[in-house]
């Protein structure tokens, strides 16, 4: 029979239940690289090591050979005073004593006042973009938002194209009704024959038997897609899927290019000296840069002579050294003891005074007389002129370093230091590979799109999910473009100084440059008088010197007439430096300085790092309704269906006369159920369905393995030395340095003219020790001595002026996870699901009598599409389909503009004082400076107050007897003596 018209198009079903959430998507692109770090500030130089204690004195040199005793002269008149003997040669130098053991470290002093902060350096040029940062952990899914109100019903879909009518069969002749045969098996479909001409209307034949159901034809091509209807309400969220397996870590990316170091800022003035801690047992730190020389301290007050110390143990006798250079000429010896009075002779006749005879030749020097007893000390002589400054002696050998002292008790924590500059960013870790894709769920029936509802109010914040494991870092992205240069913000307050770090190991560098020579120490205490030397061997007679200026007659002394002042002797050797003076009391704390004006505005800093990704935006408004598509073209006629099976031939009846046309018979009873049809073929994919509602957020991925630690940044460059700080308060005199080497002997003075020998007076009584003379002119500065003991620290001064703001700190750690964002925009349209299995065939009607197969009729026009039927019930949720292939990674977004710098916070209170740093090794002694020109002689000082008499020293070695001077003219005859005894 002819093909019936197409049924009405069904209504669009209600939206299906959302499928299970898909597997976690691929990891997002890496964030833009952070700005390059800045080099850290140079650390403070180590403190100089404490010098070891002075070693015990070496053994005393061997005593010189005593001179030969002279033959005693004959008793007679008292002889003339002998010429002063020359000073004996200096004994050989004793061996060098063993170096002393290091002294105990002093108790840590209080912390010094805080230094004035240095000026802030200009920011360095912007370095190349650093390596890309790791992706942040995926946030946990928030609770679903409230369901919006249901949208209005959608518009009916577009009317589908009119289907083609099947070929109209030719009406067969009415045959006799045969016996109903058993339905045969469905035969193969034959090829459709060409359409025949319409024949004349025949008589209605008997109803033929129902044919076997034909094979389902291929579905027609999809019609043009109608306009999208409004979006329906979102369905309830599906159950949460299982977390995917963590991906394997990917290969390590290349390290980013190293940024150029910025210029080093100007170094601030040196801070105050911290407390001196006890020397630790660790390796000493690298030698610090020598600081600027301090101001020269004023001369200290003369201390009282100390008591004789306990003699140290005698060291082993050293090898006899080479004889030292000849010492300077000694001072004249005391007059000899007057001889005993001879027996007075008889008084002679007083003769007339004779004329003075010519000077006789100088006789050979007589034998040296025995030394007389030392006479009483004479009155203190006038202060002589300052001698010529001697050349500095050779530099002594450096002593062996002292042993390391025990580690001291850690001091109180030091003040918090300024925040260091950011170091360079390390190389990024390797990227991780994407995890395995989950199975894809079957597509549910497409719902009728409703209008977009008004966004509902935000739901209550959900509980924070457990933080996901850290994802594997992704590949290093290309460096992004530099952001716009932002305006410089207000200077921030200086941050609290951080605690000092632990002492680092001793560096392997060479010793630093020698330090500047130290300031001259205070004059030492006057030494004890030396022992009187033994009489030396008389030397050869010297040439007669030029006549010296005649001195003024002295006032008559108690012990006799004062002789003529002799010439000025050569300068003596420089005295050994005295002991260290006591530290003076700490000065009062200075007034609090006024707060300085804010500094100039600095250069804008480098662009800041890209911020974290913001929450997904709210759903956009629905798009405008699209234009209706063009009507599809009429499809080509399909191939003719196969011919049905030929029925069994009926019995041949007699040909009767044609009767009148009968009325149309009524429908027969329903036929028996036919055989099940063959399975339908899979049709071509239908058109893409409408976008479903957005699915709930996917589960939080498991924490990936920890990325490899990037290489450590290179150490910053050492900055140039800063300007010298302001001069501090004048400190107390430091300890005296070690004794300098003996100076070279000065030129020998011109011998003065021998004065007239006065009449020896009676031996006077021994007088009191004279008062100490005034201090001489300060000598030239000797080589730098070892560092003295550190004095107690002064009180902590007032807080300094607030410095310029510090550099921006490192980027803080990510904060806690925020509340989940709103549902994202709808995802892309899913693939169409596979066609379901064909349903069972309907019950066939009662078979009619088979008629002959007529020719195929022409295709009629397709009927109009009927109205859509009511929506059927929602089917169950299909199984989850396999996940689609991973899409390509999106392009990297542009770097946002740098935000304005925030206002500076209020400066916090200063932190507690930090622990003192470890004591550094002592710096190498600097070379001796060039000798300066001799200073002008100072004015003679006033007589000082009588000092406390010092202890009398042991007698010095006996000096040699000097050569005999020229014989003087004979004196006038003496008065006659008293008569002798009978």
Curated annotation (Swiss-Prot):
Residues 294-303 have a biased composition (Gly residues). Forms the fibrils of tendon, ligaments and bones. In bones, the fibrils are mineralized with calcium hydroxyapatite. The keyword Repeat applies. InterPro entries: Collagen (IPR008160), Collagen_superfamily (IPR050149). The keyword Acyltransferase does not apply. Its main location: secreted. One of its GO terms (biological process) is extracellular matrix organization. It comes from the Eukaryota. It is found in: Secreted; Secreted, Extracellular space; Secreted, Extracellular space, Extracellular matrix. Keywords: Calcium, Collagen, Extinct organism protein, Extracellular matrix, Hydroxylation, Phosphoprotein, Repeat, Secreted. Residues 8-27, 89-105, 128-141, 189-228, 304-335, 347-373, 382-401, 425-437, 513-526, 583-597, 610-640, 666-682, 727-751, 874-888, 916-940 have a biased composition (Low complexity). Residues 143-155, 792-802, 838-853, 966-982 have a biased composition (Pro residues). One of its GO terms (cellular component) is collagen type I trimer. The modification Phosphoserine is found at residues 81, 586. Residues 39-53, 889-900 have a biased composition (Basic and acidic residues). Residues 1-982 are annotated as: Disordered. GO terms for molecular function: extracellular matrix structural constituent conferring tensile strength. Trimers of one alpha 2(I) and two alpha 1(I) chains. Type I collagen is a member of group I collagen (fibrillar forming collagen). Belongs to the fibrillar collagen family. This is Collagen alpha-1(I) chain. It comes from Toxodon sp.
